[in-house]
Amino acid sequence: MKHKCVLGVLKTEAGLDIKKEMLEWLEPIYDVTLVEADPPNDKEFELPFIKKACEVSIENNEPVLYLHTKGAAMPNNAQPVVRDFWKHEFTEKVDQYFNAVNGDKALASAPIVGSQNPICWFNGFVMNSSAAKQILEKLSVHEDRYWFEQQMLKESNVSTFGLYDSNAEDGNRAWRSFCYWYQTQYGVK
């Protein structure tokens, strides 16, 4: 049986290309639900995508991977690297992320999280249905597009687990963890 995944898609030209790229590695492993939004989507940001991920988790009473077409709205050089990171992590280490959220406690797992402010770097994560219920209670429109990455899990009282440097107390340590992964993966110095 495949794990569940919700992929949020911003329907820009770049977003549709990224969707195709991501589906190539997601569909063999996951039962993917697509949620698409018309650009510019500068009012709801990730809200419709995360809402659907929560609903899928609750309906099926099982963990769900939430991802989005990183780089569709504000393309830059780092975003293809993040997508490569997601591809590696969420295909090669699927069971680690899904096993980390077993249980009744509201849990989310991601490659890199900050422990003091439980953010999920790049906002790709696996959540269980308990977390989904708590997130739905707090989910609303926010003017700050980064609320979904930087505040949502904290305000929802969701415990986070990061596979890399889960004790990162600040963004700099978490970023160094990501750079270390990139360096070892691609031999970049």
Residue ranges and their predicted role:
Residues M1-K189:
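ER/Golgi luminal nucleotide-sugar-dependent glycosyltransferases, focusing on the catalytic module
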